[in-house]
Amino acid sequence: PMSKNLVPAGHTVQGFDPFPAAAAAAADNGVVVSDNAPTAVAGADVVITMLPHGDAVKRCYAEILPAASQGALFIDSSTISVDDAREVHALAASHGLAQLDAPVSGGVKGAVAGTLAFMVGGDDDALQRARPVLEPMAGKIIHCGAAGSGQAAKVCNNMVLAVQQIAIGEAFVLAEKLGLSAQSLFDVITGATGNCWAVHTNCPVPGPVPTSPANNDFKPGFATALMNKDLGLAMDAVNSTGSAAPLGSHAADIYAKFATANADKDFSAIIETLRS
């Protein structure tokens, strides 16, 4: 849905998606859908990719870089490892092309609303070129540093988010057992020091936030499978750097177990595990 906000902003958008439903949705939003990725890239000033993992990004870049116009700017909004992001950046540079890693936060709602947070790694000159394309999709654009820094920020942010979502779930389960209504706890947390996105937007119980996935049988949102993937990247980074992350590590274990049977549910559904 990110492309939905580019056409109204005056951009001509060519795209490719191997999944017919996604391609059809993009076409409905005014995207000129191509039969393959190199065709979609041909003639483009800016090329944005979003793929499920680093190997897919590297394979895609190997396929599309030779088809790119001279001077094209590449932006990868996938969530991948810092090492993979730097490898992709170097691959683009070997073709004489500028590249940014720009993963996002905000989920499907943010993509539709054009309020995503972009965490950007790469040269400032490249970011300034990217701004007219990113801004229609963004609520915030944060330059995090050199190549790979956007991915570093993303895995750190999502490790925090996972811990928060579990803690919020624990609080609502405890409140239930103490006889405190969900609405009362929501009002207290959102008006006090515990306030965070995991409650004011992604509240894990029905009622207080009508648009939260909890009101729609935990339809994502941000799927548990994606949170589990991001926590895997975070743990890889923790281990490779020798960092201490006891809460992050425990959250990763909890989500890894939950994902085995609940991968397609919103990650706020972790409250179901806490109840049981």
Ranges and model annotations:
Residues P1-T49, A67, A72, H143:
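NAD(P)+-binding Rossmann beta1-loop-alpha1 motif at the extreme N-terminus of oxidoreductases
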Residues M2-L6, V88, V133, L174:
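Hydrophobic residues within alpha-helices
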Residues V13, V33, A98-L100, I141, ...:
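Hydrophobic beta-strand scaffold residues
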Residues P18-F19, H53, D123:
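Residues in the short beta-alpha loop(s) of Rossmann-like NAD(P)-binding domains
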Residues A37-A98:
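Rossmann-fold NAD(P) dinucleotide-binding segment
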Residues I80-N158:
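Rossmann-fold dinucleotide-binding core
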Residues S149-I270, R275:
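Helical "substrate-binding/catalytic lid" subdomain
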